[in-house]
């Protein structure tokens, strides 16, 4: 059965506390989806944000973003008093998040709540810690150590900690026991609220599509705790990093800077690191969108230290062997493959063999340079249709900034009119396609423009801030 849904980041939900949370406004959004006949809510990664505020560059692939914890829910549980947070000025506007203010003010409030939680832990607290022992203790220690080192990257820590020498880790766990307990308690609060929100959505017949970045940030507990799974030298610096080559959209390419996986090492244990990661994501979401799927067929490797993506080389990825290992352990997880960008036959062949639906972005369909595959009359059933993703302009922004000939092509193709509204006409275009699922950005439903764009790739500042 064909279905539709809306892309709305949790961070963008309305809230009086500076950023969207998993509280009343999230449940009201679920109610709206249900009443509107929608079947899916797509979100961006829910992991903690760090430098640059991008959810795709996180300290942890498993942890939840503390900013999303709803303060009113904590107050209802007796973990906070209204006077402890209602007065705070989050220094934001109704349309923009101020991440600096959140960083300065949110954690003090959460520490108060966690002190009360830990003074009398709920019955399921120890069980939560036990079930998540494959990542939570390392994460809590990592965050405690980052705080102790003024936020410095783990590569700048003392050699024994950087190299995870057992005696150094044991001593750190004693020294920072209180902080470690705080970071574990924060994750308990996050996942308790997340599972309640997901259950509420599922009860309303709304399924949640989560987002899984292919790569891990260098300054993350994931790299620090599993250096053997990444391409690092003896000093634990990357030998090469991830990105995209120069093309018609960027003369110097995209330098992401993430460390690359050591696929040969991962293959030796049946890709256990990835199996754990996918298992966790499948328990967190109903459907998982994997970002940059083409990187599993072949990935672009840039020498560490380069200032641009020029000078990189294509290298062979794990291919189907990775997904065979995942399917052997997990069955058939519901996965959407983000197969955008520079595609070659090996990528297309891998997608066909996996059987996952790929993505079609309507805005790409009218690019005079190369758009034919993205026009909706040709969308296969096994695909997910978008007008645009978080990396694209809302329709009204696209109409104002795209090349005039591209806009004219869209107007002719879809018979767009101002009377209908160009944004409604573009949404109509994907809803009328054969794709099994169509997703529209909340910004397009609201008729917003460039001011509401979520992210502009390869730029710093002003991204990830839009609020409804």
Model-derived segments and spans:
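N-terminal regions that are enriched for targeting/export leaders
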Residues: 1-11, 27
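Alpha-amylase-like alpha-glycosidases and glucanotransferases acting on alpha-linked glucans and related
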Residues: 9, 15, 53-191, 216-439, ...
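Outer-envelope exported proteins of Gram-negative bacteria
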Residues: 44, 207-209, 213, 287, ...
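Catalytic domains of carbohydrate-active enzymes, especially glycoside hydrolases
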Residues: 24-49, 280-285, 430
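Acidic, mature catalytic/reactive cores of soluble proteins
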Residues: 2, 162, 202-204
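Active-site-adjacent substrate/metal-binding segments within catalytic domains
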Residues: 6-8, 21, 43, 101
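Conserved, well-ordered alpha-helix/loop/beta-strand core segments that scaffold catalytic motifs
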Residues: 183-216
């Amino acid at each position: 059965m064909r279905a539709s849904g809306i892309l709305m980041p949790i961070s963008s939900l309305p809230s009086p506390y500076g950023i969207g949370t998993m509280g009343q406004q999230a449940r009201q959004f679920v109610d709206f989806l249900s009443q509107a006949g929608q079947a899916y809510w797509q979100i961006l990664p829910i992991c903690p944000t760090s430098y640059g505020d991008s959810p795709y560059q996180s300290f942890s692939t498993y942890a939840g973003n503390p900013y999303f914890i709803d303060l009113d829910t904590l107050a209802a549980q007796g973990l906070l008093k209204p006077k402890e947070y209602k007065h705070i000025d989050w220094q934001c506007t109704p349309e923009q998040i101020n991440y600096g203010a959140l960083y300065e003010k949110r954690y003090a409030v959460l520490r108060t709540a966690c002190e009360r939680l830990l003074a009398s832990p709920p019955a399921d607290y120890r069980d939560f810690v036990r079930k998540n022992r494959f990542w939570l203790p390392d994460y809590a220690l990592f965050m405690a150590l980052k705080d102790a080192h003024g936020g410095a990257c783990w590569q700048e820590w003392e050699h024994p900690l950087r190299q995870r020498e057992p005696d150094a880790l044991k001593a750190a766990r004693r020294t920072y026991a209180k902080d470690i307990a705080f970071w574990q308690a924060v994750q308990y609060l996050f996942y308790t609220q997340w599972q309640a929100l997901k259950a509420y959505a599922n009860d309303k017949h709304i399924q949640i599509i989560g987002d899984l970045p292919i790569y891990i940030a260098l300054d993350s507990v994931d790299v620090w705790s599993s250096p053997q799974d990444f391409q690092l030298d003896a000093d634990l610096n990357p030998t090469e990093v991830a990105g995209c080559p120069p093309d018609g959209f960027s003369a110097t390419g995209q330098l992401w800077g993430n460390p690359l996986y050591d696929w040969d090492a991962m293959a030796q244990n049946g890709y256990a690191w990835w199996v754990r990661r996918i298992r966790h994501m499948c328990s967190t979401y109903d459907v998982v969108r994997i970002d940059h799927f083409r990187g599993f067929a072949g990935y672009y490797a840039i020498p560490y230290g380069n200032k641009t993506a020029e000078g990189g080389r294509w290298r062979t990825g794990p291919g189907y062997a990775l997904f065979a290992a995942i399917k052997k352990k997990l069955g058939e997880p519901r996965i959407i493959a983000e197969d955008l960008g520079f595609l070659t036959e090996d990528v297309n062949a891998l997608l066909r063999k996996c059987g996952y639906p790929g993505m079609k972005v309507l805005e790409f369909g009218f690019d005079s340079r190369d758009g034919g595959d993205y026009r909706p009359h040709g969308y296969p059933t096994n695909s997910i249709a978008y007008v645009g993703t978080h990396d694209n302009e809302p329709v009204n922004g696209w109409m104002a900034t795209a090349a005039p000939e591209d806009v004219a092509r869209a107007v002719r193709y879809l018979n767009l009119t101002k009377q209908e509204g160009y944004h409604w006409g573009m949404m109509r275009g994907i809803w009328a396609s054969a794709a099994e699922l169509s997703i529209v950005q909340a910004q397009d439903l609201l008729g917003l423009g460039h001011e509401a764009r979520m992210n502009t790739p390869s730029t710093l500042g002003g991204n990830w801030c839009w609020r409804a």
